[in-house]
Every structure is written in C-alpha cells, then in structure tokens.
Amino acid sequence: MSGKLYICPTPIGNLEDMTYRTVRILNEVDLIAAEDTRHSIKLLNHFEISKPLTSYHEHNKDSKGSYLINKLLDGENIALISDAGMPGISDPGEDIIKQAIEHNIDIEVLPGATASITALVGSGLETAKFAFEGFLDRDKKVRRNQLEELKEERRTIIFYESPHRLKDTLKDMLKVLGNRRIAVNREITKKYQEIIREDIETVINIFNEKEVKGEFVLIVEGFKGEKTVQNSYEDLTEREYVITLMENGMDKKDAIKTVCKDRKLKKDVVYKQVLDL
C-alpha cells in the first residue's frame, strides 16, 4: 500500500503561525522533503521535530522527485515543506504533487500561511475575484510582454517580487498598466512588516527615497476602463459581432452602428438580427 504525501505550510515570517496539526504531521511522517534543508532544520529544531530531512528544490526536482515517489510507493509517508508558506505555490512542489497524482498516491494538503492571500485580504482592493501571477520574468522585454497580457485584466492581480527587481517592476507596471492603485506588502508577518496602499507612481517615488529590503507581495488593482476592441471579426456573423462588442463594454446602439459602418450595411439589416438582445 502506498504512503501519503502531506503538503505542509510553514510560517511566512512569524513562528507563532505554525499550526498544531502541521507540527503533529511533521512528527509522524517517515521523511520530510524541504526546499532548503539548512533553513528548514532551524524551524524543525524550534518545534523539536527530529525526522529525517532531504532536499527537494528547483535544481534537483527531477532526480529527487523520482526518489520521493518511490519512497511513497514503498509505503512511506512524506511531508513536503517550502522555505515559507504553502508548498506548490511558485515553487517546485507543484511538480511532485503532479507526479504523486499520476501514481495514484494519496495527497493531503494542510491549511496554513500563504503570503498571497494574506496580502490580498489586507490590500483594500477587491477580493471577490483575483488572479495570482507569482513572479514576473527577470528579462525586461519578457516582463513587459507579460504585463501587456494583463493590461485589461479586470480582476485584482497578485505578484511576488524580490527587493533587487522591485523598482524596475514598478516602473514597468506604471508604463504598461497605467497609474492604478496598488498595495505593496513587505516582510509580511515579520517584525518590520510594512503595507503601502497608494497608486503606482506614488509608490515609485517612495522607494526612490528609501533602501529596498525584504520580500514583497504586490496587489494591483484590476482594469477599470473599457476594453480595447480588436479588429479581427471577419469570421463572425453580424449578430456575433454585435455580441462581442457588447461583451467588451460597448452598448447595443453603438455596437450596431459599429457593425454597420465596418460591414457597410444598413442599420435595419443588423438590427433585425439582434432584436432579442
């Protein structure tokens, strides 16, 4: 019988956020797989957890992933932890979880600390709908292309960012997304936690005057304007064309007018096709 893979979240800055259940599971499993064993051993020692520890990270995930799967298939129970927060979110834990599912291995995800949701809730921006993007690319051109794809995203957007790229990322956001509201979360739950709720331009000015330290979660307001209408509707019927324009924020009257002008049709020809809209 196969063992079970436990996904165990760890504190993102404050050790008091470690749950009783996580401590119990870590004490019960046969093996703990950690992103950085040097970092995790300190956490385990603090909670007096003395279980075998092995590394599982981006640079060894292929070979170590196979090793862990074989251990699980042999009946061992394994706990997966990351340096901070929920494994599988912007880290290689995603891969071992997929492999476990492919091998029909039971997986149990324990609830706990997650930087993205913690930052979102305290942002003051819309929380009903959001998009998690994680880290943007290091390359400036690729990063801007990624932001271009999100330019008209109406949901609140969550990003992770490192201190040495923060200023460049904020400048790219201002250029591509425009000067919208943002909540910049630094060192969440730690001693020097800071949340700046301003517009992007103001935040850039703030960090131009201070040293950038710590890890950041950026919560960016979703797009509030009218979406850009693409001119690639040749294959649509007049009715489909009108519906598409309306879905992009145009009212019915203007949509009909646009279709008539684009297709050189009389108004009544198009109007008859959309009477029920």
Briefly describe each language-model feature range:
Residues G3-L5, G75-A79, R155-T156:
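Loop/turn-to-beta-strand initiation segments
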Residues I12-L15, D83-P87, P163-R165, F223-G225:
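Short glycine-rich anion-binding loops that position phosphate/pyrophosphate groups of nucleotides
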Residues M1-Y56:
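Glycine-rich, flexible N-terminal cofactor/catalytic loop recognition
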Residues Y56-D62, L136-D139:
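Conserved helicase motor
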Residues S2, T156, P163-D276:
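A contiguous loop/helix-start segment that scaffolds small-molecule binding in enzyme catalytic cores
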Residues I96-E153:
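Class I SAM-dependent methyltransferase SAM-binding "motif I" and its flanking Rossmann-like core
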Residues P92-E94, K252:
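Glycine-centered tight-turn and secondary-structure capping sites
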Residues L26-I32, N104-E108, T156-I157:
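Short active-site oxyanion
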